[in-house]
Structure formats: structure tokens, C-alpha cells
Amino acid sequence: MTEYVYDMSDPERDALTEHFLSTKRLGCGRFACFAIEGTDPFANIARQLEREVFEASWGNDSVTMKQEYGPYDESSLFFMVVDTQDKVPAAALRMIRNSPVGLKTIVDLDDCQKSPIAPTAIPVDEVMRHHGIDDLDRCWDGATAAIPRRYRRKLAATHVHLMRIMALAAMREDIQHFVAVLDAPVVRVARDILGLPLIPLAGTPPFTHMDAPNNQAVYAHVPSLLGLAGRRNRKVGQRIKASFADEALPSPDQFAAR
């Protein structure tokens, strides 16, 4: 049984990353992108990166991360970028699938302490009704995005690859809805500059989330997002469609773009 760890030492993280890379066929590029199931032992690399970035930014230590995200570890799907030259993780995104414990963003809205309009909670049924969500199994929760500061200006070249494997996974799992809690400035850039169809989740205002101020819970209709991406980047759209032209779809652990 996999132990879900948020407090590895740097040498432990680096050794696990090197082992992970030894199991993959890599191209000639410096950065490689992968999808990793939350139950995979290698997902601890992404958990470690989450903790490092969140602790540096907001003081969220391993105990806090385990408390907040531990209940969702087995229903998580990580998208991870690895620096194959230095053999260290360069970025990690966590999507949470629906499970008996629910989707974290929606569960938190139904909590009288964590809700954006606390002490008033927003019931799960109200969120579903507000956005026309019939089945939470077709919804992803964009739980975390962690990029170490030294890589934040170096990942532009991998952005398209990362978005591609995420889109492939979403299409494979027939995901129709997306929820998340994002920094309000990120929401403004995504919505006003990039034109992404993000709207406040259940009409909620910005709020403080996990000690980080100025956050916004958001919703997006996934087919609209994918359609927009396809129109704005025709080559990526064609590559996604080509990937799904084959009868056999790859499993998440086979998704890798170089």
C-alpha cells in the first residue's frame, strides 16, 4: 500500500525523481510532462513539491497539507513537469476526482468555517443546481498548482505540452465541469486577458483560503475550455483530435509530452 508523504527530505525527493525518470523514455528536451495517479508511489514527488511551494508562499507545512489534501490523495490525478537535466520536479498540478469524500472546493463551500461567505455555507446541491452539474463524477477540482520560483520563467515552452496531456485526460474521462480556488489576480488574467470562460463558483466573492488572501472559487464548462483552446491553437487542437482518432486510448500513466 502506498504511503502518501508530504515531508520528504530533498535527497529523498531527488532520489525518487531520478528513479522515476529511469522508468521513462525521454526525448531530447530539458522538460518532460507526465500524468501520475495519486495512488502511484511516484506521486509523492508532486506532493513534496506542493508542500515546498505552499510552505514558502503561505506557511502551509506538511501537517497542514496532509490535513487539507490527505483525504483526497487516492482520488487525485497529478500532472507533473520534470527538469530532466537537473532531475528535479519543476511543476505539479493536482486534479481531484469525485469520490465518497467529495471534491475539495465544493466540500469547503459547504463548510461554515471555510466557505467564502462564512459563517454561511453553500450546500453541494446548490452548487450543482447553480451550474447545471448533473453528475459530480464528470467534474474535476483543480486543487493545487505548484511551480518553484526558479522555474516560473522557464516553463513557457512546456505550457502547451502540459495543457495537452491535461486535455487528453479530461476528454478520456469525459470531464464536463471544472471547479477550483485560484488567486484573484490569476482569475483576472485568465478571464480578461486570455479570455477563458471562468465564472465565480455559485456567485461567491473573493475570500481568504488556507491563510492566503484574495482567492476566488471558480467554475468552467470543460468542453467550452477545450473548444476555445482548439480555436486559439489549431496545432494543439489537431494533435488532441489525432490522439483520439485511435481506437485504444492511453491510460493516464502513459500520457507524456516532450
Regions found by a protein language model. Give the residues of each.
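Extreme N-terminal leader/anchor segments
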Residues: M1-Y4, P11-R13
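Accessory, usually C-terminal, subdomains that scaffold auxiliary metal cofactors
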Residues: V187-V189, I193-A257
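Acyl-donor binding region in acyl/amide transferases
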Residues: I106-Q216
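Non-catalytic surface loops within mature trypsin-like serine protease
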Residues: R97-S99, R149, A184, V222-S224
